[in-house]
From Swiss-Prot:
One Pfam entry name: EFP
GO molecular function, one term: translation elongation factor activity
NCBIfam families linked: efp, PRK00529.1
InterPro entries recorded: Elong-fact-P_C, NA-bd_OB-fold, Rib_uL2_dom2, Transl_elong_fac_P/YeiP, Transl_elong_KOW-like, Transl_elong_P/YeiP_cen, Transl_elong_P/YeiP_CS, Transl_elongation_fac_P
SUPFAM superfamilies, per the entry: Nucleic acid-binding proteins (SSF50249), Translation proteins SH3-like domain (SSF50104)
Localization, UniProt: Cytoplasm
HAMAP family: EF_P
CDD domains in the cross-refs: S1_EF-P_repeat_1 (cd04470), S1_EF-P_repeat_2 (cd05794)
Name of the featured protein: Elongation factor P
GO biological process: peptide biosynthetic process
Pathway in which this enzyme or protein is active: Protein biosynthesis; polypeptide chain elongation
Function: Involved in peptide bond synthesis. Stimulates efficient translation and peptide-bond synthesis on native or reconstituted 70S ribosomes in vitro. Probably functions indirectly by altering the affinity of the ribosome for aminoacyl-tRNA, thus increasing their reactivity as acceptors for peptidyl transferase.
């Protein structure tokens, strides 16, 4: 059990059997009565935001969550297949639960998988990845005056905007949270 004094950004709590992540919290004392904690929570099952107010000292549940190191193996229909690195069990995760992160997965890549009551909830990618450009149009020579970008398809199939000087075969660093180009490797 967590008390409201334990609240911090990113803490995962359970309310009425539903897991939430604390996005924002603020302690406040109204003119009358005891102190309160106003929170903004993200439902981890459906990604919806919820506002909730707790009395100071109120207890909330601790969800049965664990993070496991897994290796991405392959795509099977709409599922992504991962292997647990400690037990060697295979785990199927529906692609739509990954919130667009599946586009960054390469075969044999290691990721952390968040499990809630033994069921996969989300995958945790590194903040940045280095991927190879497989398709992009050639840049016009001398067009370096402005900050112009062009679309480029990466080895995993996602398309990002890259500067004009990036060519096919270049390895680029990409921010996995924003899909922004960070530089060449």
């Amino acid at each position: 059990m967590y008390s409201t004094t334990d609240f911090r950004k990113g803490l995962k709590i359970e309310i009425d059997g539903t897991p939430f992540e604390i996005v924002e919290f603020q302690h406040f004392k109204p003119g009358k009565g005891g102190a309160m904690v106003r929170t903004k929570l993200r439902n981890l099952l459906n990604d919806r935001m919820v506002d909730n107010t707790f009395r100071s000292g109120e207890k909330v549940g601790r969800p049965d969550m664990e993070t496991r190191e897994m290796q991405y193996l392959y795509r099977e229909g709409d599922d992504l297949v991962f292997m647990d690195l400690t037990t060697y069990e295979q785990l199927h995760i529906a692609e739509d639960t990954t919130d667009g992160k599946a586009g960054f997965l390469k075969e044999a890549q290691q990721v952390r998988v968040l499990l809630y009551n033994g069921k996969p909830l989300d995958i945790d990618l590194p903040v940045s990845l280095v991927l190879e450009v497989t398709d992009t149009e050639p840049g016009a020579k001398g067009d370096t005056v402005s900050n112009v970008t062009k679309p480029a398809t990466l080895e995993t199939g996602i398309v990002i905007g890259v500067p004009i000087f990036v060519n096919i075969g270049d390895r680029v660093k990409v921010d996995t949270r924003t899909r922004d180009y960070l530089g060449r490797e």
